[in-house]
């Protein structure tokens, strides 16, 4: 029996500004991700700070949360076997200069901060992140 895993994907303001959402979603579907929930929204600074609270004491916290509140984002709940690892591989390295050819960040990211997409890094993180943006009833079964 297959064990399906869920992960959060965020298409960040820089990629939305480049109108990359459709291309990124196509990449996800072509890599057998199932989209259980999707929405476009514009975070407030407080919402961005709540989402990234784990980084509150890091030097990049304020610039990151300012950036994440600077424009619309697309949040998705993705599902497949090994969803977290597979999505992180598709995203590419956090620093787009180190990202492999063919990855989302290599194509659309400009810098470590403006790096086009976010993805959960572990099961517990995914649970928190998904619940931050989606109520259970908002996700397809």
From Swiss-Prot:
Catalytic activity of the protein: a 2'-deoxyribonucleoside 5'-diphosphate + ATP = a 2'-deoxyribonucleoside 5'-triphosphate + ADP; a ribonucleoside 5'-diphosphate + ATP = a ribonucleoside 5'-triphosphate + ADP
Pfam families, alphabetized: NDK
Chain coiled-coil ranges: none
UniProt xrefs under InterPro entries: NDK-like_dom (IPR034907), NDK-like_dom_sf (IPR036850), Nucleoside_diP_kinase (IPR001564)
CC terms in the record's Gene Ontology section: cytoplasm
Subcellular location: Cytoplasm
Cofactor: Mg(2+)
Keyword Kinase: yes
Entry keywords, A to Z: ATP-binding, Cytoplasm, Kinase, Magnesium, Metal-binding, Nucleotide metabolism, Nucleotide-binding, Phosphoprotein, Transferase
Residue sites binding ATP per the record: 12, 60, 88, 94, 105, 115
CDD domains: NDPk_I (cd04413)
Molecular function via GO: ATP binding; metal ion binding; nucleoside diphosphate kinase activity
Active-site residues per Swiss-Prot or TrEMBL entry: 118 (pros-phosphohistidine intermediate)
Entry-linked SUPFAM superfamilies: Nucleoside diphosphate kinase, NDK
EC number: 2.7.4.6
Assembly, per entry: Homotetramer.
Protein task: Major role in the synthesis of nucleoside triphosphates other than ATP. The ATP gamma phosphate is transferred to the NDP beta phosphate via a ping-pong mechanism, using a phosphorylated active-site intermediate.
Name of this chain's protein: Nucleoside diphosphate kinase
Gene behind the chain: ndk
């Amino acid at each position: 029996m297959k064990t399906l895993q869920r992960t959060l994907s965020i298409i960040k303001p820089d990629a939305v500004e480049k109108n990359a959402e459709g291309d990124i979603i196509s990449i996800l579907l072509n890599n057998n991700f199932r989209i259980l929930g999707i929405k476009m929204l514009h975070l407030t600074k407080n919402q961005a700070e709540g989402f990234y609270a784990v980084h509150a004491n890091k030097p990049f916290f304020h610039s990151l949360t300012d950036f994440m509140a600077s424009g619309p984002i697309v949040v998705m709940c993705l599902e497949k076997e090994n969803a977290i690892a597979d999505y992180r591989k598709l995203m590419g390295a956090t620093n787009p200069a180190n990202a492999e050819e063919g990855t989302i960040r290599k194509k659309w990211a400009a810098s470590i901060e403006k790096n086009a997409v976010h993805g959960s890094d572990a099961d517990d993180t995914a649970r928190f992140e998904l619940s931050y943006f989606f109520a259970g009833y908002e996700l397809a079964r």
